[in-house]
């Protein structure tokens, strides 16, 4: 009978990927990124270990949503003080902090525990087309999140 081989920290290699978010759909992109961060696309996936890769997302300011979500989708945060609830629409947040939109979408798709917090640190989001991670020699990953027939 064969034994199940669990990966060890020594034989794990974490790759770096660059994804261009220009014109991509937010939710579809976030699911793909969460899968890569978790390592579910690898044969060495183990639920309790960090087997995923690093992901750099560029052009976060040009991400798209469908329908009326641009005006209706709300992002909430709380300062911790009484009456400290702040609400902001997708449209306003995209102008002010476009990175936060992608980060919150991906964070919601990761586990809600210490492993999820560790995986989230491997996501790097930048509003513009440049990033400071050239030394890691990231591979360009093309993800097509636009369904066939959509504009």
Curated annotation (Swiss-Prot):
InterPro entries according to UniProt: Ribosomal_uL13, Ribosomal_uL13_bac-type, Ribosomal_uL13_CS, Ribosomal_uL13_sf
GO molecular function: mRNA binding; structural constituent of ribosome
Source species, domain of life: Bacteria
GO CC annotation, single: cytosolic large ribosomal subunit
Keywords per UniProt: Ribonucleoprotein, Ribosomal protein
Single biological process term from Gene Ontology: negative regulation of translation
Gene3D superfamilies to which the protein is assigned, alphabetical: Ribosomal protein L13
Function, as annotated: This protein is one of the early assembly proteins of the 50S ribosomal subunit, although it is not seen to bind rRNA by itself. It is important during the early stages of 50S assembly.
Stored PANTHER family: LARGE RIBOSOMAL SUBUNIT PROTEIN UL13M (PTHR11545:SF2), RIBOSOMAL PROTEIN L13 (PTHR11545)
NCBIfam families: rplM_bact
Record-stated family: Belongs to the universal ribosomal protein uL13 family.
Quaternary structure and interacting proteins, as annotated: Part of the 50S ribosomal subunit.
Protein's name according to its UniProt entry: Large ribosomal subunit protein uL13
Gene: rplM
């Amino acid at each position: 009978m064969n034994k199940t081989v669990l990966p060890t920290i020594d034989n794990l290699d974490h790759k770096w990927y660059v994804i261009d978010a220009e014109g991509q759909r937010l939710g579809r992109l976030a699911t793909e990124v969460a899968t890569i961060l978790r390592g579910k696309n690898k044969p060495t996936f183990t639920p309790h270990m960090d087997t995923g890769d690093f992901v750099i997302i560029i052009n976060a300011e040009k991400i798209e949503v469908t329908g009326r979500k641009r005006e209706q989708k709300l992002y909430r945060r709380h300062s911790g003080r009484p009456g400290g609830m702040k609400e902001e629409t997708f449209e306003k947040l995209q102008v002010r902090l476009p990175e936060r939109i992608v980060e919150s979408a991906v964070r919601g798709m990761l586990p809600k525990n210490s492993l999820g917090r560790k995986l989230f640190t491997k996501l790097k989001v930048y509003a513009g087309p440049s990033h400071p991670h050239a030394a890691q020699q990231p591979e360009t990953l093309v993800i097509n999140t636009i369904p066939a027939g959509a504009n």
